[in-house]
Swiss-Prot record:
Its main location: mitochondrion. Its EC number is 7.1.1.2. Keywords: Electron transport, Membrane, Mitochondrion, Mitochondrion inner membrane, NAD, Respiratory chain, Translocase, Transmembrane, Transmembrane helix, Transport, Ubiquinone. The keyword Mitochondrion applies. Signal peptide: none annotated. It comes from Coturnix japonica (Japanese quail). The chain crosses the membrane at residues 25-45, 52-72, 95-115, 124-144, 149-169, 178-196, 200-219, 247-267, 274-294, 326-346. This is NADH-ubiquinone oxidoreductase chain 2.
Amino acid sequence: MNPHAKLISIMSLALGTSITISSNHWILAWTGLEINTLAIIPLISKSHHPRAIEAAIKYFLTQSTASALILFSSMNNAWSTGQWDITQLNHPTSCLILTMAIAIKLGLVPFHFWFPEVLQGSSLITALLLSTLMKLPPMTLLLMTSQSLNPALLTLLAVSSALVGGWMGLNQTQTRKILAFSSISHLGWMIVIIIYNPKLTILTFIIYSLMTSTVFLSLSQIKVLKLSTMLISWTKTPMLNSTIMVTLLSLAGLPPLTGFMPKWLIIQELTKQEMTPVATTIAMLSLLGLFFYLRLAYHSTITLPPNSSNHMKLWRINTTPNTPTAILTVLSISLLPLSPLITTLV
């Protein structure tokens, strides 16, 4: 991809995200979402592979549909109440349409089918952007309107996402699809608490972004796209594979790693809100995700006997130190002792 085109796309992503998260008017927020959509499409299709082109088309169709629904929801609310302010979403039909639109944007169940396919057709770095940065604008809109939305509907979407994200990730062999279903499952945890404690949703999103960035950057460094390739990478980069294993366990939410903190706080908050059945259900559903995280961790640390490979130049792996990955790894596995301080700040 042309470096200038890549720079323009990245700058447009930053611009679109900034516009959406800082605006109070629906038209400005919609404009930022559209800039984001148009900026990420060249990054998805940069390899010119048929799968990448297909992923870009799927992404464009789903995101444009969701953006149209957001615009329709805001116009319907303005027609009924005379308000274009994002926080003044009071019309019930507008609230329902907006919930559906943001569910499509985020890839929540039952509007999740596009997300694994788009990630599978993208490079690892583009998949990282789709899993973290591109979730930020719709999540911001959801945070700003959460007090107007239906709690029962959001809880249903959250529990369904945790169930489907864990269940459909069990049988996957492609790392990008596994991480896509991981993202859907984590979104369920964020959505279930968004009405009762929005700051906890922000904390969960930040920690999820840290852990997911670590995994994607590490996989990109050792050029692993599927489990069978991960099996033969241990002998070449044992230290990096070890950090991937620990980060995956953190992503699964095992103590004493960082990923345990948001799940613990969410279950605690749900119990305070007298939603113990929901807390129990979503905690049990996280065991499904734990299975495929352990599967990934297991594949990252076992070795195969010497065998021939069809991959060209597989042994030529860049082993230069990667400072961002190292910093993200430390944050992804060691923040749990600081949880009292973090919760105080948030």
